[in-house]
Every structure is written in C-alpha cells, then in structure tokens.
Amino acid sequence: MTLDDWVQSHRFLDPLAQVRRRIDAAVEQAMPPLPPLSGWDDYVEDFAIGVPLLHSQIPIDLEPGGHAVVRVIHSLASDPQCPTLAEDAAALSSQFQADPLAPRRIVDWLLGDDAWEPVRSGLLRSVGWITLAAGLRPLVQAFTAWRDDDRWLRRYCPTCGALPAMAHLVGVDPGRRRFLRCGRCASEWRYGRTGCPFCETESHRLASVGVDGEGGLRIDYCEACRGYVKTYNGQGDESVLLADWTSLHLDLLACDRGLKRMASSLYELEPVASDAPPPFTTASGEAECESRGNMASLR
C-alpha cells in the first residue's frame, strides 16, 4: 500500500497530506544528510545510564539542521498554493532574519530549551522536526545498528528523548516483540510487550481498542494512567501506518474515549462541536491549503 492509496481511502487527510507534500518537498531541497559519527566510544557511558543521544556530551553539530529549517520556512513563506501556511511561515521567517543566532536557537528550542520563544511555535515544531528527522536519518540508522536494543528498554526515545507516538508489533507469538516509534525523529526502539511506556505499569496485557478496516492499526492504552499508543499490528505498510499523521483519526477516537496522548505531537487535534459535520471530512487549522475545518493542523 502506498501513501496515496491510504489518503485516497481516508479523504479527510487530504488537506494535511497536501501540506506535508509541500513541506517534504522543501525539506528535500534544503536539508543535506548530517554525517554519521566516526565512533561511539564517547557515548558508551551516557548510553548506559539512559541519556538520549542528542542530549549527551558527544559532539554532534546540529546547527546545519537549524540553517535548513530557516531555508524551509523561507520557502514555505513564498508558497502561493497555501496562503495560510505561507502567512505563518512569513512571520517566522521575519523573526529569523532579525536574529543571526536563529539557527542555533531553533535547534536548542526543538530539544527543549525554552529560553527563546518563536512567534509560531506549532508550525516551527512541525517543520523543525520534519526537517531534522530527514537530516538525522543516516545518524539514526548508524545508531540503531550500533546499539543493543536489550540495553535500552526505556520508555523514551534513545535519540531525542521523546515519548513514543506509535508502536509496532513484530513477529509471531510466543516470540513477538514490540517496538516503539518516536513521532519527532522517527527512531524505533524495543520495549516490553505488556508495560505501559508512560507510567511504566506492568500488566498481563494492555487494553486495546480495535478499529475495523484500518490496516491493522489499533489503540493500546493503560488502564492505570489512561495514556495510549497507536499500534500497528502488521507487516509491509510501516512507512505509511507508522507516520503518526496518517492515523490522526485514531487520536480523535482515543480522545472521545477519555484517553490521553502522552507523546508530543507535530499536529493539533481540535475539538468538534456536537452539531458539527463528522470530524473525518476535513482537516485544517493554521496550515490548511483551502478551507478551515476541525480535525488537525500544524499548530
């Protein structure tokens, strides 16, 4: 199944898919791959005590990623096809042009430094992490090959430290394994089959909400903390079904059931009034291309 096939069968994702295509095209032009590390010896100690790679003492120059984010935002600001997106991007671009330290501030802010405040924080969070994830791909692949998954059975991302947005069940019982996936940098890591990745409660099994006709996607949630993770129970469509934004309707379903999204999101889910049209007919917000609706936006 391709991404186009999925969007074609989930037409409410169309506006967000259009925005993602424009962002992805701008990122492809602006973000060169960051080089992988020459060695991992300096990270061994931090890894052993649970320090995520991008928060460790190992020297990783992410400032080129900050410069790439500036270029992507500048490109989006001049996109006539998405005027609302262009307007928000133009506000960010003006802020960047007035600050020669903007590339460094962007990277620090994406990693959790609140000393600086962007004028369109949601848009920068979305575009910033989409851009950084593209540049970090070779590093993430090398990191995955180097580390022993059995030594990182932690609830947060080994690369950037975020809580998981998705999970993937791999293999068959009794040896089936669960891998968590970061919604920011797209890293994957192994975690226990039955533990909650948010409050770390252990139970015989997590509660689940199945969704018919959704390609093996379901919602797994913890009855103790009510946190949930969207889970793909299948093989072959990982690039589509583990993308987070392609299953935002499951986030709405979870919200309707009183469950909590613990992971950070690059998209905002907006409440729908009881007399409004069904929430899966449009997607919108600050970064819409045509009409404003009620499902999701780049904040």
Enumerate the language-model features and the residues they cover.
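N-terminal alpha-helical interaction blocks
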Residues: M1-T144, C289
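Short N-terminal helix-initiation segments at or just after the protein's N-terminus
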Residues: P100-L101, L123-I130, L163-V170, R257-L259, ...
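Cys/His-clustered metal-coordination modules, chiefly Zn-binding fingers
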Residues: P138-G258
